[in-house]
Swiss-Prot record:
Keyword Metal-binding tagged: yes
NCBIfam families the UniProt entry points to: PRK00024.1 (NF000642), radc (TIGR00608)
Protein name as catalogued: UPF0758 protein Smed_1459
Any Gene Ontology biological process: proteolysis
Length: 260
């Protein structure tokens, strides 16, 4: 009886053929598991988005609102430390969005593109608030005026002098920044203010400037400058309705204090 010879052992060398001309298929190595850190922040992002979708902003802390914005700006990094660092540096969401670009850059993890996008959010907010003043009598929408001016100016690091030009119905014609000054002074020239009002056919003005210190208390120079502008405008039929000083801590109306 003839014995069947044993089958040859397969070649142990990768890629070599056995006697049956069989080429072993190369095994694709299993994908490495995602780092635990990646899995952590992706899961956190999903949970935070779900909470916002279901409950709205009332369910989120300020740093979590910032996180939601930073998710798209910084797609592959844990943004919670950056959001908390921004709030620690600038105090509030308004402070973060109102901060100048060069100060935003000083926060670790905030590159130029991120800082620009944060400022874009602030710009959209300002435009939204300003749109509330269009085609409305400004004096009857005073809270909207204050909200807009506070958003636009309260967190500026230098003094800024802004004028709201109104027509005879007290509707906003133009909103212009006339001067940028130092941290505690802005040069203002009454004749230039009146000249611009005449160019726009404005019949009334509201002056607004900020105090970067945060304290909106008017200085003697603020009061004197207001009186000079009122005196220059009055003979030309231009009324000065108010001069509002904006600070991080609130605002002051010189008209309300009967200072001119």
């Amino acid at each position: 009886m003839t014995k069947t010879p044993p089958a040859p052992e397969p070649d142990v060398l990768f890629g070599a053929t056995d006697e049956r001309q069989f080429i072993p298929q190369q095994q694709t190595p299993a994908a490495a598991p995602a780092p635990a850190e990646d899995a952590h922040y992706h899961g956190h992002r999903d949970r935070l988005r779900a909470r916002y979708r279901e409950y709205g902003d009332a369910a989120l802390a300020d740093y979590e609102i910032l996180e939601l914005i930073l998710f798209r700006l910084i797609p592959r990094r844990d943004t919670k430390p950056i959001a908390k660092a921004l709030l620690a540096r600038f105090g509030t969401l308004a402070g973060v969005f109102g901060a100048p670009l060069h100060l935003l850059h000083e926060v670790k993890g905030v590159k130029e593109s991120v800082a620009l996008d944060l400022k874009l959010v602030a710009t959209a907010s300002h435009r939204m608030l300003k749109s509330e003043l269009r085609n409305k009598q400004v004096l009857s929408s005073w809270s909207a005026v204050i909200d807009y001016c506070h958003a636009a100016m309260a967190h500026e690091t230098k003094e800024q002098f802004r004028i709201l030009f109104l027509d005879k119905r007290n509707t906003l014609i133009a909103d212009e920044v006339q001067q940028q000054g130092t941290i505690d002074h802005t040069p203002v020239y009454p004749r230039e203010v009146v000249k611009r009002a005449l160019e726009l056919s404005a019949t009334a003005l509201i002056l607004v400037h900020n105090h970067p210190s945060g304290d909106p208390t008017p200085s003697c120079a603020d009061i004197e400058m207001t009186k000079l502008i009122a005196e220059a405008a009055k003979p030309l039929g231009i009324a000065l309705h108010d001069h509002v000083i904006i600070g991080k801590d609130g605002h002051v109306s010189l008209k309300g204090l009967q200072l001119f």
